[in-house]
């Protein structure tokens, strides 16, 4: 089974090697037919402390690092865009 990958925005990087990522999902309400926005915060492991508040990042399911931290940072979009820009 493949690991889930989510995209979100870093809302906190105050703790060592941990970031809090807000992931927003949208769906259509079954009765009202209105688009509803819901968000959830995920604690993710950031080994190198590279992610900063406001960055858009990808997180991936992983082994439990602690009671609440079961996701890890895959890459941040700013670093990926910078690497693509220097490679091109």
Swiss-Prot record:
Pfam families linked: Ribosomal_S17 (PF00366)
GO biological process entries: translation
CC terms in the record's Gene Ontology section: cytosolic small ribosomal subunit
Alphabetized GO MF terms: rRNA binding; structural constituent of ribosome
Keywords assigned: Ribonucleoprotein, Ribosomal protein, RNA-binding, rRNA-binding
InterPro entries recorded: NA-bd_OB-fold, Ribosomal_uS17, Ribosomal_uS17_bact/chlr
NCBIfam families for this protein: PRK05610.1, uS17_bact
Family label: Belongs to the universal ribosomal protein uS17 family.
Subunit details: Part of the 30S ribosomal subunit.
Reported function: One of the primary rRNA binding proteins, it binds specifically to the 5'-end of 16S ribosomal RNA.
The protein's name in its UniProt record: Small ribosomal subunit protein uS17
Organism: Methylorubrum populi (strain ATCC BAA-705 / NCIMB 13946 / BJ001)
